[in-house]
Amino acid sequence: MLRVLIVDDEMLARDELAYLLKRTNDEMEINEAENIESAFDQMMDQKPDLLFLDVDLSGENGFDIAKRLKKMKHPPAIVFATAYDQYALKAFEVDALDYLTKPFDEERIQQTLKKYKKVNRDIVETEQNSHAGQHKLALSVGESIVIVDTKDIIYAGTEDGHVNVKTFDHSYTVSDTLVVIEKKLPDSDFIRVHRSFVVNTEYIKEIQPWFNSTYNLIMKDGSKIPVSRTYAKELKKLLHI
C-alpha cells in the first residue's frame, strides 16, 4: 500500500488533494500535516513513500524540508503542491519528483502517481540487477533509453536545471531526478558530495581545498566538482584523509 503524506497549512487544500488522491482508486494510506514539525514527526513514525509538500507553510519554507529530507537514507519522493508556479525550476534542483499548482486537477494527479510508480519500479529493478551482479544503468534520454555501465560514469549532477550523467565519451541529459539516479548507483563506488552532485570515487584525481571548509574535486576527465561542508566529512572518512 502506498503511504502518502500531505503537508499544507491550509486545511481545505489538504482535504481537496486527499479527496482527489482517493478518487484515483489506488490503494493508499493518506495522512496530513499542517507544519514542518508535525510533518517530520509523522515521517519518522509512518515513513511515507510519497510527500505532497506546499512551498509556503505559514512562514516556513517547503524547500527547507526538502533539503533536510535529502540527507535521509531513504527519503520519500517529493511532489511540490503549491499555488505558485515560479518555483518549479527550484523544485527540480532539490530533486522533486513533480510540481503541481493549485487548483489541483485529477488527471494531472494521476500523471504524478504514474510517474512515481515508474520511478519506483525502475529503482526496484536496478536493485535487483545489482544483487544479481549486473552493473548496467538505464537512462531516460528524451524519447530513448540509453544503457551505460555504472563503472563508466564519472559523475551525475544537476547543472542549469537539468540532471546530467557524465562519462568520458558523453554527457547525457536525463529526465530522472538526481535522487533517483543516486539510488540506482552502487554505494560501493559512488558518493554524494554536494546537493547537486554524486561522483564515482574511482575517478577522483585531486582534492583541492576551497573556502569555508569546502573543497573542489578534480576528476580524471578534468571536470571540477564542488564539495559542500555538509558532505566533506563523509568524503574524507571514505578516502581516509
From Swiss-Prot:
Function field: Member of the two-component regulatory system LytS/LytT that probably regulates genes involved in cell wall metabolism.
Pfam family, one: Response_reg
Keyword entries, A-Z: Cytoplasm, DNA-binding, Phosphoprotein, Transcription, Transcription regulation, Two-component regulatory system
InterPro entries: CheY-like_superfamily (IPR011006), LytR-like (IPR046947), LytTR_DNA-bd_dom (IPR007492), Sig_transdc_resp-reg_receiver (IPR001789)
PROSITE patterns for this protein: HTH_LYTTR (PS50930), RESPONSE_REGULATORY (PS50110)
4-aspartylphosphate modifications at: D54
Annotated HTH LytTR-type domain residues: 137-241
Gene3D superfamilies associated with the record: 2.20.25.10, 2.40.50.40, 3.40.50.2300
Protein name: Sensory transduction protein LytT
Modification after translation (UniProt): Phosphorylated by LytS.
Species of provenance: Bacillus subtilis (strain 168)
Domain Response regulatory stretches: 3-117
SUPFAM superfamilies hit by this protein: CheY-like
